[in-house]
C-alpha cells in the first residue's frame, strides 16, 4: 500500500512537472490580414541603471520571439535611447549608475537582437544629444547605429 501511494505521488509530480513546461502564453492574431507594429517608448530609464537593463532586454527578446506569431512588420522607438549622451563618469545616482558609453553600448546590443529580423525605426530624443540634455547637436547615435545597420532592408516573406 505504501509503495502504491509513493508511486501515485511520483506520477502526479511527474505530470505536474511536464505540465509546467508547456508554453501557454501563445499570442496570435485572429485576423489573417492583421499585422503588428511594436512601440518601445523612451528606453532611457531602462538603460541608465544596470539593474533596469534586463527589463529592456526582455522587451526586445519578447519582440524577436513574437515576430512571426504577431506578424510584426516594424518596431518603433520614440527616442531618448540614453539618459546622457556624453557623460564620462557615472552621474549622480538619480541620473543613473552607468557612463554614457555603457548606456549606448547596452541599447545598441539590445536592438541588435532585432537586426536582420524586423525593420526598426528609432527617433532620437533630447537626451541623445549634447552633454546631458541637447545643449548642442553632438550625438553618439551614428556611432552605435550606423546607417548600414538601420537601412530598411526588405525581409522577404513566403508567398
What do these predicted regions represent?
Residues 87-156:
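Extended active-site neighborhood of metal-dependent phosphoesterases/phosphodiesterases
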Residues 1-22:
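Bacterial Sec-dependent N-terminal signal peptides
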Residues 14, 31, 68, 114-116:
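Short, structurally constrained coil/turn elements
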Residues 12-14, 52, 90, 153:
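Alpha-helical transmembrane segments and their juxtamembrane interfaces
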Residues 5, 35, 73, 118-119:
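A generic hydrophobic-helix recognition signal that picks specific residues
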Residues 20-98:
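N-terminal active-site segment of His-dependent metallophosphoesterases
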Amino acid at each position: 500500500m505504501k509503495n502504491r501511494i509513493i508511486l501515485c505521488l511520483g506520477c502526479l509530480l511527474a505530470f505536474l512537472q511536464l505540465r509546467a513546461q508547456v508554453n501557454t502564453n501563445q499570442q496570435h492574431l485572429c485576423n489573417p490580414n492583421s499585422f503588428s507594429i511594436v512601440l518601445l517608448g523612451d528606453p532611457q530609464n531602462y538603460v541608465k541603471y544596470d539593474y533596469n537593463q534586463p527589463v529592456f532586454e526582455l522587451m526586445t527578446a519578447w519582440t524577436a520571439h513574437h515576430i512571426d506569431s504577431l506578424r510584426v512588420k516594424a518596431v518603433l522607438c520614440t527616442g531618448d535611447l540614453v539618459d546622457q549622451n556624453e557623460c564620462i563618469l557615472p552621474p549622480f545616482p538619480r541620473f543613473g549608475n552607468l557612463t554614457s558609453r555603457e548606456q549606448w553600448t547596452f541599447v545598441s546590443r539590445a536592438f541588435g537582437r532585432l537586426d536582420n529580423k524586423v525593420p526598426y525605426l528609432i527617433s532620437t530624443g533630447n537626451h541623445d544629444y549634447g552633454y546631458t540634455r541637447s545643449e548642442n547637436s553632438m550625438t553618439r547615435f551614428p556611432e552605435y547605429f550606423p546607417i548600414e545597420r538601420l537601412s530598411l532592408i526588405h525581409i522577404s516573406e513566403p508567398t
